[in-house]
């Protein structure tokens, strides 16, 4: 149950969209995969030769898997992640002063905001510097838990678990790696 993330979650989507849209899909995606595995196992295990064997009720399976497996484990993982430093808040993005000044170049613009070009058509660059950085915030720990447990690919931040707010310590990294394998190992 992996999915491709072709967007930067921290800048593209609101907290509400991340929570109600993507998190629900992360739970349903994982529950669907597990329910299909259950149906397949029931189909192989059926001893009924008259063609009337049942592989179960998909909606009952989805509900039970979500309520009795995914939600409790995700809750425990989210509490652990928050305790280890994964952010879980609804704060606005924070602008902080950096330790050292960052120097960079940017295109020089005319009065209309269009980039100026030199004789060869290349943009004219000007030196700039900054001493501030904007840090994204948000309810990350709760979404990180189901992302890892359900082996879903899309994270809160574009860098996923490589971002220090999603994976701040080696211990959280270990638990995230183990949580990816928890359900597949339990189903085998």
Where does each model-flagged region fall?
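P-loop potassium selectivity filter motif centered on the GYG triad
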Residues: 1-22, 88-177
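A conserved hydrophobic secondary-structure block that centers on an alpha-helix together
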Residues: 13-90, 170-188
């Amino acid at each position: 149950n992996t999915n491709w993330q072709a967007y930067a979650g921290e800048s593209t989507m609101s907290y509400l969209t991340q929570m109600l849209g993507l998190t629900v899909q992360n739970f349903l995606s994982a529950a669907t995969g597990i329910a299909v595995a259950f149906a397949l196992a029931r189909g192989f295990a059926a001893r009924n030769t008259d063609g009337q064997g049942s592989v179960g009720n998909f909606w009952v399976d989805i509900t039970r898997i979500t309520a009795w497996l995914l939600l409790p484990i995700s809750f425990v993982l989210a509490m652990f992640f928050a305790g280890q430093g994964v952010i879980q808040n609804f704060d606005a993005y924070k602008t902080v002063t950096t330790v050292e000044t960052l120097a960079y170049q940017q295109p020089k613009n005319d009065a209309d905001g269009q980039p100026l070009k030199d004789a060869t058509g290349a943009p004219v660059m000007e030196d700039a510097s900054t001493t501030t950085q904007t840090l994204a915030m948000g309810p990350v720990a709760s979404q990180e838990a189901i992302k890892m447990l359900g082996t879903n690919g899309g994270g809160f931040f574009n860098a996923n678990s490589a971002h220090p707010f999603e994976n701040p310590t080696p211990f959280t990294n270990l638990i995230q790696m183990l949580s990816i394998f928890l359900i597949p190992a339990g189903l085998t």
